[in-house]
Amino acid sequence: MHQRALLFSALAVAANAQQVGTQKPETHPPLTWQKCTAAGSCSQQSGSVVIDANWRWLHSTKDTTNCYTGNTWNTELCPDNESCAQNCAVDGADYAGTYGVTTSGSELKLSFVTGANVGSRLYLMQDDETYQHFNLLNNEFTFDVDVSNLPCGLNGALYFVAMDADGGMSKYPSNKAGAKYGTGYCDSQCPRDLKFINGMANVEGWKPSSNDKNAGVGGHGSCCPEMDIWEANSISTAVTPHPCDDVSQTMCSGDACGGTYSATRYAGTCDPDGCDFNPFRMGNESFYGPGKIVDTKSEMTVVTQFITADGTDTGALSEIKRLYVQNGKVIANSVSNVADVSGNSISSDFCTAQKKAFGDEDIFAKHGGLSGMGKALSEMVLIMSIWDDHHSSMMWLDSTYPTDADPSKPGVARGTCEHGAGDPEKVESQHPDASVTFSNIKFGPIGSTYKA
């Protein structure tokens, strides 16, 4: 994900476990989804969702004293990373009451502001202790989404990252929390706002955010490949692969992490920019939005296909295709209107041409490009989230960005939102009731999840 305001992880060090609290039982909201076959028949799967550990109450193992309040650590309980992991526990979640997360059948609704809480990030579970893993290669992933209540500056995201299915418990055996409590997060920004990474707290070097009352930046980050199927609001949308040098989660240190949270964006082992297909950025301003061809005032079905060179589930990723279904009509993705950039799907040729046309540094190719992304797609965890952006106010998605660039230059205009419209303070005060609803998740071979 290009920039992410709210992030996390939690695991444990040998002999210094991150603990599990006993103040509230953890009950995962149920969520059904469908697994389809080549013949187009689908069977219902009984899953559930879990909220990321970074959102959870973190308190002393001995009582209810907070280990973390606002965006600062309790220095007595957390003088260093190892002591903090030993002294502190994450606890169960009140999904609806605290986080504004509700499910019904196949439907998941994420509310933006609930009390003091802002945003959320949920993972699809296979069972109570394990994230659901997906092999996207030679398959397609389909879901319905309602973005009508997502104004400028918000992002209702559905994406995959190469997290460990157990949240890291087997790699760090003293991790007592694991996937059940939403541990193990990583992405291509190598996020440093995570309170726990690889079994240790992230308190050493922690700097509270100057503009986010709930977040800060620590000394470590958590990196892994990320496949952004859907980053969107009612104005703009983007699909973006982000490869990394390693196909699984790794920990980084300081500004060597790169990404949004570091002084040098391209210093790390991942591609923080990715190769994005945003119809508006690719020159088609009438395709996606309120009253447009894909009308964001109504629910839509989003289909994403992962084509391999040899047509097998183990082949090299060669193309990522997108289409929509709305009001019973299949809508092909918009075609690029940018000079010297052709097509309506993501391929190696498209990415190379797009970077050149936009004058962007080709960090995508540096970290393996499309084939590198494909190497990570066999074991991916599904994430659904709602968030605002304390780094760049989501202008990279729905406005003109960089802010000092000429809007008429190719690649600068990404949507119709005005500068400042997505300022987190503004959207949190003016649109606390914003929300996104995902439903009818389907997964299976190419062509099996929708009616042509």
Swiss-Prot record:
CDD domains: GH7_CBH_EG (cd07999). The keyword Transmembrane does not apply. It holds the Pfam family Glyco_hydro_7. Coiled coil: none annotated. Residues 406-432 are annotated as: Disordered. Residues 1-17 form the signal peptide. It comes from the Eukaryota. GO terms for molecular function: cellulose 1,4-beta-cellobiosidase activity. It catalyses: Hydrolysis of (1->4)-beta-D-glucosidic linkages in cellulose and cellotetraose, releasing cellobiose from the non-reducing ends of the chains. The active site is at E226 (nucleophile), E231 (proton donor). It is found in: Secreted. The keyword DNA damage does not apply. The biological conversion of cellulose to glucose generally requires three types of hydrolytic enzymes: (1) Endoglucanases which cut internal beta-1,4-glucosidic bonds; (2) Exocellobiohydrolases that cut the disaccharide cellobiose from the non-reducing end of the cellulose polymer chain; (3) Beta-1,4-glucosidases which hydrolyze the cellobiose and other short cello-oligosaccharides to glucose. This is Probable 1,4-beta-D-glucan cellobiohydrolase A. The gene is cbhA.
